[in-house]
Regions:
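Protein-protein interaction/assembly regions in multi-subunit complexes
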Residues: 1-192, 199-201
Length: 201
């Protein structure tokens, strides 16, 4: 008679934003199946918040330059793509950036509405030269997985959409090793060296 054992899950915090799970025992062959399924689900199906686009007066596409800003719009968008945010509600929000040069504009200078927090405040957004100014609106939204810039378009011709990566999970890895519990079975060690970017806990 086949006797199935109920797997046990143990969790261990390995440091800031790092977690390890051990699931054992599993029937032979189940470790790879379960591990790959969990990995794909964590990387693609965990909801999060991301930048969907920006609005700067006088700028209507990404292949242009902004007077007084060292980076072009494309580089600025790539920098904002790495912005990590915590949002208390499920609403879309607009953040503002008002800065004057010379010097770097950091994510800490982004003005957020109540319930929105920038996690990586040391992120460099752009560099202003001389006494130039930057007045920019940054739109953020909730979502799952990856969204192309075309899906973030609005009716506003001055709005520049950006590809959005909503997943707060940065990396997932797993290993399967044999364990002895009466007979040879699988043990799934699911570990993520850098699983979260800080927007969830």
């Amino acid at each position: 008679m086949l006797m199935l054992q109920r797997p046990e899950i143990t969790q261990e915090e390995l440091g800031k934003n790092r977690t390890q799970f051990v699931i054992e025992p599993l029937e032979p062959g189940f470790g790879l199946t379960l591990g790959n399924t969990m990995r794909r689900a964590l990387l693609s199906r965990v909801p999060g918040v991301a930048v969907t686009g920006i609005k700067i007066d006088g700028v209507n596409h990404e292949f242009t330059s902004i007077p007084g800003v060292v980076e072009d719009v494309l580089d600025l968008l790539l920098n904002l793509k790495r912005l990590v945010l915590k949002v208390d509600d499920q609403e879309n929000h607009t953040l503002t950036v008002k800065a004057k040069g010379p010097g770097d504009v950091l994510a800490a200078q982004i003005q957020c509405p109540a319930g929105v927090e920038v996690v990586n405040t040391d992120l460099k957004v752009c560099t202003l030269s001389d006494s130039s100014t930057l007045d920019m609106e940054v739109s953020i939204a909730h979502g799952v997985g990856y969204r192309l810039a075309d899906k973030n378009k609005t009716s506003d011709s001055n709005f520049i959409p950006i590809d959005s990566i909503f997943s707060p999970i940065v990396k997932v890895s797993y290993t399967v090793s044999p364990t002895q519990v009466g007979q040879v079975t699988d043990c799934l060690l699911y570990t993520s060296p850098s699983p979260r970017d800080g927007r969830i806990s």
